[in-house]
């Protein structure tokens, strides 16, 4: 007899309704809730899934390598990266006739193709790849690695090769391994690749499997390293006239501290990047020897956290401190065990860090691009900024979700008595109310300023606008070296201590050249009143998103309205009809509501980045500066003008290469709008509709030839909300992704 899905829950498997299917899917990855699950088995299953996760990533990367080598134009692009458009892949079956086939036969191809806006060409070129053969070799190597990963995942599920629970919970050993091996060695290995392969290739010296053991990356080899003359590796860097990929103007340095960007490629100096990675690698390896493991020396987390409190005999604030300002509690006592025993706490920390890093990458790739010529591929820059910002918001919403699950499932009040976690829970009303106040202040004031400016412009008196200069932000830019504001502070003042120290550094340095360059290549673009207003609009969105998420996590265990909330779990719709006011207050609901605000916020942030850069790239900063001070300017001069090009991807007179984005733009709107159908109508509506459809099905002679085992029932309220927010988010992303790419590509290709 076949086992009914889901095999991990016999209770669900015996459910006679379609609830069996939907709840089975919903809980498939909630390993903690599965039948017969032990803590050790939970860790082992999660450990094994990591191998599968890495394998999926590897297949994705290998697929990119293979398809570009097969269907792209990598070698042609390498020969002229500033003028040849990179091809992502061929389009096998362009629908809608010859017109679309002709429109999509582009970038020198002989058949319909998609243009590549992912930056992969720039990345591979920068790290030293030059031929399709090298791309194929990379794909094959990664596929072999994937096979090993899949084998490793399977192996670690076998009884003899399952790690023990103690192994998973040895935090010191894990931290040493992650710091020294994963981060330390890989950073130094990447420096090795840059020094031995990428930098020689950037200077016209090919390095391949045939000669990488014989080509010296530096004329003096390892002699300066062993003699302590490390400065030799920084001498004779590439000149400002260096033609990337050739020996013209090339130097011999491999580890430099030049600052700024390569004038021709527009990217950070490769020798600066290699220096950056070796420095990080050395620090990480030192850090990887800090924690006590095999030899009984070094720190332990428990000693650090338990010693970090105002009751500890070594606390510097001990004498008289508590008498003056009150007792601070047990601070971090118990925190190590709390984190080490909660996978949700650990995942929350990891997601918060990775989400922040993703947002940092979004900004970094625009302001300080690492890859040769990517700064001049404006559509790719816009696509990558948008991509990484959207990733960031979902990761950070996930961080708070798992923080809330920690409070519901893993938090032990006794183990955390009077420590920082308990203190945060005790002061949650103050935290939440202050955040609420900040949101109202930001929202009302920012909207009022925008609306005032809209009204006075509508009445023909733009001189009556309230325009606030962002003087504090300009001060920060000046401190970093931007001189246009006339603020003589730090690096903007040639006689300040930092400027004199910088001037005293040996060799040439180009940071000041970059920060004071023309706007389209400057990483600190000039800012004014429009920036001030949109900054506060984005701040409103960030604070409101944070308010919803923080409130959801801090109230996850209980609130004045519902003190026993933790007993209902992380996600529940309401506590039945007899207890009013308990709908929409589960911790899951706060994540659900925060996603809408997060999407709003990141749209505003990306609108801002995109419009400002479009204006800079077109040499028309005045348009942004004048139109961004009022809402109609945003609607008319950014959204409407740029949407019009996409909507005309196809029309009664013909079709062009923007048409795929036009279809995506419309389809994204459709998916987005479909979300509201699930968000507004609740479970009863769908149950009645299903029953009507079943009635009609059973009375149709042909349809009734097909039956079903499970009684059809509507999704739960929580599941319907998930369907709604998923449609909203996916539609939002498809709409805006198509908008960004098409509106930029229509101007710059």
Curated annotation (Swiss-Prot):
Chain ranges passing through the membrane: 46-69, 135-158, 175-199, 273-291, 343-366, 382-408, 430-452, 532-550, 590-611, 658-680, 722-742
GO biological process: photosynthesis
List of residues binding divinyl chlorophyll a B3: 677, 685
GO MF term set: 4 iron, 4 sulfur cluster binding; chlorophyll binding; electron transfer activity; magnesium ion binding; oxidoreductase activity
GO terms under cellular component: photosystem I; plasma membrane-derived thylakoid membrane
Sequence positions that bind [4Fe-4S] cluster: 574, 583
Residues holding phylloquinone: 686
UniProt-annotated location(s): Cellular thylakoid membrane
Entry binding sites for divinyl chlorophyll a B1: 669
Function comment: PsaA and PsaB bind P700, the primary electron donor of photosystem I (PSI), as well as the electron acceptors A0, A1 and FX. PSI is a plastocyanin/cytochrome c6-ferredoxin oxidoreductase, converting photonic excitation into a charge separation, which transfers an electron from the donor P700 chlorophyll pair to the spectroscopically characterized acceptors A0, A1, FX, FA and FB in turn. Oxidized P700 is reduced on the lumenal side of the thylakoid membrane by plastocyanin or cytochrome c6.
Family the UniProt entry places it in: Belongs to the PsaA/PsaB family.
Entry protein name: Photosystem I P700 chlorophyll a apoprotein A2
Organism: Prochlorococcus marinus (strain MIT 9303)
Taxonomic placement: Bacteria, Bacillati, Cyanobacteriota, Cyanophyceae, Synechococcales
Gene this protein is translated from: psaB
């Amino acid at each position: 007899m076949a086992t009914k899905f889901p095999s991990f829950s016999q209770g669900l498997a015996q459910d006679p309704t379609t609830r069996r299917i939907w709840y089975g899917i919903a809980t498939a990855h909630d390993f903690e809730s599965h039948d017969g699950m032990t803590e050790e088995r939970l860790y082992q299953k999660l450990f094994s899934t990591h191998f599968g996760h890495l394998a999926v990533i590897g297949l994705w990367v290998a697929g990119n390598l293979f398809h570009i080598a097969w269907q792209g134009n990598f070698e042609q692009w390498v020969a002229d990266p500033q003028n040849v458009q990179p091809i992502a892949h061929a389009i096998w079956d362009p629908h809608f006739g010859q017109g679309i086939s002709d429109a999509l036969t582009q970038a020198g191809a002989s058949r319909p193709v998609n243009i590549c806006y992912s930056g992969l060409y720039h990345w591979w070129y920068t790290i030293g790849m030059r031929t399709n053969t090298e791309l194929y070799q990379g794909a094959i190597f990664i596929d072999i690695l994937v096979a090993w990963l899949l084998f490793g995942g399977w192996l670690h599920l076998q009884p003899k090769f399952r790690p023990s629970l103690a192994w998973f919970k040895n935090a010191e050993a894990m931290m040493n391994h992650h710091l020294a091996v994963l981060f330390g060695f890989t950073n130094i290995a990447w420096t090795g690749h840059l020094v031995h392969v990428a930098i020689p290739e950037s200077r016209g010296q090919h390095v391949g499997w045939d000669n990488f053991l014989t080509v010296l990356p530096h004329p003096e080899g390892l002699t300066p390293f062993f003699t302590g003359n490390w400065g030799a590796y920084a001498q004779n860097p590439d000149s400002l006239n260096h033609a990337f990929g050739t020996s013209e103007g090339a130097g011999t340095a491999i580890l430099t501290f030049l600052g700024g960007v390569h004038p021709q490629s527009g990217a950070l100096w490769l020798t600066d990047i290699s220096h950056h990675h070796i420095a990080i690698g050395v620090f990480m390896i030192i850090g990887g020897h800090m924690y006590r493991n095999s030899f009984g020396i070094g720190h332990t987390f428990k000693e650090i956290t338990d010693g970090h409190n105002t009751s500890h005999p070594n606390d510097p604030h001990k004498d008289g401190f508590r008498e003056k300002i009150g007792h601070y509690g047990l601070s971090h006592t118990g925190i190590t065990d709390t984190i080490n025993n909660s996978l949700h706490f650990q995942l929350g920390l990891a997601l918060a860090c990775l989400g922040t890093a993703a947002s940092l990458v979004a900004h970094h790739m625009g302001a300080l691009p690492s890859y040769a010529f990517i700064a001049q591929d404006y559509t790719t820059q816009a696509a990558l900024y948008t991509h990484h910002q959207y990733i960031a918001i979902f990761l950070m919403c996930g961080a708070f979700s798992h923080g809330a699950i920690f409070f519901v499932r893993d938090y032990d009040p006794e183990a955390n008595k009077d420590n920082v976690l308990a203190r945060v829970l005790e002061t949650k009303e103050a935290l939440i109310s202050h955040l609420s106040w900040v949101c109202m202040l930001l929202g009302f004031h920012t909207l009022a300023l925008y609306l005032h400016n809209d009204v006075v412009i509508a009445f023909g008196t733009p001189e009556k606008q309230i325009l606030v200069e962002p003087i504090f932000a300009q001060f920060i830019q000046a401190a970093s070296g931007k001189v246009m504001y006339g603020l003589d502070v730090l690096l903007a003042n040639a006689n300040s201590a930092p400027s004199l120290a910088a001037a005293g550094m040996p060799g040439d340095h180009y940071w000041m050249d970059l920060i004071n360059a023309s706007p389209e290549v400057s990483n600190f673009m000039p800012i004014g009143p429009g920036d001030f207003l949109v900054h506060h609009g984005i701040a409103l969105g960030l604070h409101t998103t944070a308010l919803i998420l923080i409130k959801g996590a801090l109230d996850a265990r209980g609130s004045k309205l519902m003190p026993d909330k933790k007993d209902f779990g992380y996600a529940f719709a309401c506590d039945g009809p007899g207890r009013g006011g308990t709908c929409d207050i589960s911790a899951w609901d706060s994540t659900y509501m925060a996603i809408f605000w997060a999407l709003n916020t990141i749209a505003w942030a990306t609108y801002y980045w995109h419009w400002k850069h479009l204006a800079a790239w077109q040499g028309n900063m005045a348009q942004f500066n004048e139109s961004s001070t009022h809402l109609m300017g945003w609607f008319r001069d950014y959204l409407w003008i740029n949407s019009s090009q996409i909507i005309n991807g196809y029309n009664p007179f013909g079709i062009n290469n923007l048409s795929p984005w036009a279809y995506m733009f419309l389809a994204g709107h459709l998916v987005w709008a479909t979300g509201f159908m699930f968000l507004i109508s609740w479970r009863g509506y769908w149950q009645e509709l299903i029953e009507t459809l079943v009635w009609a099905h059973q009375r149709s002679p042909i349809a009734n030839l097909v039956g079903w085992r499970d009684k059809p029932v509507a999704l739960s309220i929580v599941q319907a909300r998930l369907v709604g927010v998923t449609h909203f988010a996916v539609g939002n992303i498809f709409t805006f992704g198509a908008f960004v790419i098409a509106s930029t590509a229509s101007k710059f290709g």
